[in-house]
Amino acid sequence: MMKRLHPLRIQVHLKSDYPLFTFEQLLSTNGIRRGQTARISLKDYIEWQNFPNIMKRENFFTQRKPVTTTAKEEPFSFDNILDCEPQFSKCLAKWLLVNYKLNDYPYYDLNIVNIYTDLPQAIQICKNLMSYLKSTLSDNMFQKIKYFMVPLYKCDKIPSKLLDGIPGSVSLVQDYPVSPYFLQKKFHIEDPIQILMLNDVIKYTTHDLVRYSSDDKGWQQCFVDINKNGQKSKSFDSAIDYSCELALEQMFNDRSHVSPGKELYIPTKLIEILMTIKNNIPEHRLFIVDTPQRSSPTIISLLKSLISPRPTGSSQIVQPYSDSIFSDKRSGRICFMTDFLQLQNIYNGINSSSSSCEVEDVADFVEKWISPSERSTLSSQNGNRPQLEDIKNSSLAVLHST
């Protein structure tokens, strides 16, 4: 059961006298002007820094630049879900259809909401998925499918002609982005909704940097302080904001496994989204694909895990170049690789007994849902590298409702 939040402390005893800005305030004021001072939580600062580089109108032939991790100064390329197409979309369509027939048919439509940041990718997957369903379903059944494409951030004036050639009822939702609209508005959807985040959302959900203070006997949140000359500095404060405290409550209900002083990135924005989905769309099913944080456990660590619970770790930050958070350059995107097993625990904790999810590799998911005829076709492609090999070698993972 989810732990009840304690009343928040009034944030009047900040160590900095700089005015506090949120991401929404930075958007409305177009940032911090020269000569102006500001204090911004690190998660809001990263979101502000990322924002111009996420919802771009990229075409289908845009080549993304590799980024580097802070741990190693070497290129790090994320796997592309389109390398698994169209087979992945066929398997996803089967998963959606089976769950729909088992749980919601014939009383409800099959409502699919794809939250996206990469519009060309979202359109391609939608086209593959809807084309497959069109080819396998009766007209009456196919008409019950309603597909909605919802941006993570506002993306204006998307031409509807981009949907030409996609069969069925497909809508581009432009006026109601997930952030900040859905996270701030009061609404309730009673119909069952299938929510997709397909390899272009989780890595861009901003994180808080936190640490547990033995002196304060409590958590501290990281802030970025900007002086009149535009110089930036990092500081930690025990006066944490609401969304950070919400994330901490979900992740660390047992502090016995917290290492004092250790800095951890926690998925604040993602937890906020999952909480909003749970409260406002209770009859939902979730399907997430992304690059997870993976570890190579030693024999000693495996033996320890049998004795004591697995400690909650930090997400891995991935930057365009070293220390790009505090640089004046704004040409790249800061990403995070999150431990999917921790996300599974977080999701199951938020939804308690009402809903649960499980984690598996993309290759295992496709293996469950591919048909023998599809396997035969993909295994013998004319002179090309078989797509099943690409899927088998993919580092992508799936977190989906059970």
Swiss-Prot record:
Domain of life: Eukaryota
Catalytic activity: L-arginyl-[protein] + 2 S-adenosyl-L-methionine = N(omega),N(omega)'-dimethyl-L-arginyl-[protein] + 2 S-adenosyl-L-homocysteine + 2 H(+)
Annotated GO biological process: methylation
Family matches, as Pfam families: Methyltransf_28
EC identifiers of the protein: 2.1.1.320
Signal peptide: none
GO MF entries: protein-arginine omega-N symmetric methyltransferase activity
Location(s) in or outside the cell: Mitochondrion
A cellular component annotation (GO) from this entry: mitochondrion
Keyword line: Methyltransferase, Mitochondrion, Transferase
Main location: mitochondrion
Note in the entry: Present with 1100 molecules/cell in log phase SD medium.
Main function: Arginine methyltransferase involved in the assembly or stability of mitochondrial NADH:ubiquinone oxidoreductase complex (complex I).
Family the UniProt entry places it in: Belongs to the NDUFAF7 family.
Name this protein carries in UniProt: Protein arginine methyltransferase NDUFAF7 homolog, mitochondrial
Taxonomic lineage of the native organism: Eukaryota, Fungi, Dikarya, Ascomycota, Saccharomycotina
